[in-house]
Each structure stands twice: as structure tokens, then as C-alpha cells.
């Protein structure tokens, strides 16, 4: 197997990051490459559903009200997966990481620490209208219509600067 590769997906809520990441995972598996797919949003939903800690209660409240989580929560969730599951032999597919500027140096340090020096960044650019339609059709509990606009707005305000 060649050296592990990191793939980092960026895009607004509803842009199709998860769909594209899953397609990439299937492709890599067909090529007999092991990969770990870390989908931050899914990790947040799993944490809320499986934990009754004060942190999970607060996290649920923020998500249910269309808010943006504090920087440490998503970092903790995706670094926990790396610590537990990553052996250095798998490709990494990261979906929904680095949602704010303070997360960028953490992600950069992860890439350096694991010697993933040339991550492939995939940025999915879709219109707000397209993303809104997709979010409404998913039926997730966090895709409440009144919070969709705020999520798309904070993508522009917080995520785009983190990407740059």
C-alpha cells in the first residue's frame, strides 16, 4: 500500500460533503485501501444520543437552536476517533472539520503529527438555495427550517475564513 492520504471535505451544510465522502470511501475500499471516515456532524449526533453528560446536554441545546459549537467540542470528537482508530496505515477522510479559524492550526498540527503532509482538500461550492432544498429533504432533527439560514450564514462567516 502506498502512503496514507488525507482527504478534507469543506462545504456548507447540505452541500453534499457526506455523500461525496462516502463515495470516496467506497472507491478507496474497491482499491483495497483502508480508510477512516470522520464525519464531525455524525459524531456530534452520536455523542448527543449516547451520552447524558452535561456537555452532551449543552451540545444538544446549541445544535437544536441552530448554533455553532465551541471550538473544543468538534476537535475533541474527531481527535478521539484518531486516537482510538487511526494506526497510520489508513487513508483519512475528514468531513466537517475545521469549522472555525481556531480549528485550522489544530488540523494542521494533526496532519504534521501523523505525517500526512499533502492533504487533498475538496471544497464543495453550492448555492444557498440548493443547500436549503437538500437540508429540508434530509429530515434530520437538526435541519430545522428556521435555523438553516443561520447555519449557511455561519459557514460564510466562520468556515470560509478557516479554509483560507
Write out the residue ranges for each language-model feature.
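Glycine-rich phosphate-binding loop of ATP-dependent small-molecule kinases
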Residues: 1-164
Amino acid at each position: 500500500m502506498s502512503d496514507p492520504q488525507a482527504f478534507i471535505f469543506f462545504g456548507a451544510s447540505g452541500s453534499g460533503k457526506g455523500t461525496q465522502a462516502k463515495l470516496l470511501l467506497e472507491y478507496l475500499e474497491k482499491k483495497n485501501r483502508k480508510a477512516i471516515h470522520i464525519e464531525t456532524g455524525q459524531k456530534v449526533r452520536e455523542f448527543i444520543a449516547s451520552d447524558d453528560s452535561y456537555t452532551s446536554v449543552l451540545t444538544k441545546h446549541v445544535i437544536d437552536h441552530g448554533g455553532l459549537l465551541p471550538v473544543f467540542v468538534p476537535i475533541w470528537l474527531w481527535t478521539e476517533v484518531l486516537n482510538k482508530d487511526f494506526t497510520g496505515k489508513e487513508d483519512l477522510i475528514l468531513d466537517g472539520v475545521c469549522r472555525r479559524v481556531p480549528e485550522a492550526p489544530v488540523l494542521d498540527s494533526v496532519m504534521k503529527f501523523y505525517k500526512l503532509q499533502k492533504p487533498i482538500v475538496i471544497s464543495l461550492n453550492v448555492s444557498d438555495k440548493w443547500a436549503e432544498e437538500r437540508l429540508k429533504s434530509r429530515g434530520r432533527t437538526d435541519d430545522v427550517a428556521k435555523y438553516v439560514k443561520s447555519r449557511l450564514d455561519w459557514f460564510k462567516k466562520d468556515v470560509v475564513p478557516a479554509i483560507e
